[in-house]
Design a protein with these regions (language model features):
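Alpha/beta catalytic cores of nucleotide-metabolism and tRNA/nucleoside-modifying enzymes
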Residues: 1-3, 57-63, 81, 92, ...
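Non-catalytic, usually N-terminal nucleic-acid engagement modules in DNA/RNA processing proteins
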Residues: 1-97, 244, 251-253
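Short, well-ordered coil/turn segments that N-cap beta-strands
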Residues: 13-14, 37-41, 67-69, 99-103, ...
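Conserved beta-strand positions
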Residues: 18-19, 73, 133-136, 165, ...
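Conserved, mostly hydrophobic/aromatic
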Residues: 44, 105, 177-178
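Conserved radical SAM core fold
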Residues: 72-80, 112-113, 131-142, 172
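Short loop-to-alpha-helix "cap/lid" segments that border enzyme active sites
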Residues: 98-101, 109-129, 139-163, 178
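His/Asp/Glu-enriched short active-site or ligand-binding loop at hydrolase and phosphoryl-transfer sites
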Residues: 128-140, 189-196
């Protein structure tokens, strides 16, 4: 994860967290209550995990509990019209709460044209600060999410918004390539569990990147995994060191 927003300069870390996991896991929620005042916390609605945004009332509950730095607006996977409808309705609810943080809209669509139409509905709104591009949006474009980002840049559709990449590909090609590409200039940040997921499975991430190991799918109980034993912890540390090395590459922020 890397940010280019000067407003984040004071923050030690950026966290993307799930509203539905806050609801299910008191320990998880308590941790983010502690760090929300110092770190940059993005509250996600869990659309990728649940197939549709977690109930608005649940997400709003955790907006009030945590006062996060940024909130992901309601959306529905691959559904342009429902995403626009839900996001606009959620913005009204946030206004009623007098939420003063930032908001992230996540364009959706059944094809590339619909995705761009959805983007246009958010691009000029002053109450939308960030555009989130979820990983599977890349399936709408011939060359994946990198193709999507290149088209955004060519069409000059990035505007004055921050851009955040939701999730990473299993081979981590994007983290290896995007720092060297022109699209890097408007991307603020990325979140991914890949380095931790590999570690818990005993897999060194450099082996996945080299194609000599297969990426293990994230465990269903990922958010409830116990603290790792020493051998697994060593692999997780290795994977996080690889992440640090990738982030030292020449991002043009």
């Amino acid at each position: 994860l890397r940010d280019r927003d000067e407003e984040l300069g004071h923050a030690r870390s950026m966290h993307l967290i799930m509203a539905h996991v806050c609801e299910e896991n008191p320990e998880y929620a308590a941790f983010y209550k502690r760090v929300a005042g110092e770190d940059y916390v993005i509250l996600d609605n869990g659309a990728y995990e649940l197939g549709a945004a977690a109930a608005d009332e649940m997400t709003l509950k955790w907006v009030k509990e945590l006062n996060p730095s940024e909130v992901v607006l309601s959306d529905k996977l691959f559904d342009r019209d429902e995403t626009i409808k839900r996001s606009k309705a959620f913005l009204i609810k946030l206004q009623k709460l007098r939420f003063e943080g930032k908001t992230m809209a996540v364009p959706q669509g059944a094809n590339a044209a619909e995705w761009f139409e959805c983007l246009e509905s958010f691009r000029y709104r002053e109450d939308v600060h960030t555009i989130g591009v979820f990983l599977k949006a890349g399936s709408l474009f011939p060359e994946g999410r990198e193709d999507l980002l290149n088209r955004v840049k060519q069409l000059k559709r990035f505007g004055d918004k921050n851009w955040h990449l939701l999730g990473s590909d299993t081979m981590l090609w994007e983290l290896q390539r995007i720092p060297h590409l022109p699209v890097n200039a408007f991307i603020r940040s990325m979140d991914t569990t890949k380095f931790i997921t590999c570690g818990y499975a005993g897999v060194r991430v450099q082996d996945v990147m080299a194609g000599t190991a297969t990426y293990p799918e994230r465990q269903q109980d990922y958010f409830r995994l116990p603290f790792p034993e020493e051998k697994i912890l060593e692999i997780i540390d290795n994977n996080l060191n690889v992440a640090e090395q990738l982030l030292r590459k020449p991002w043009s922020f």
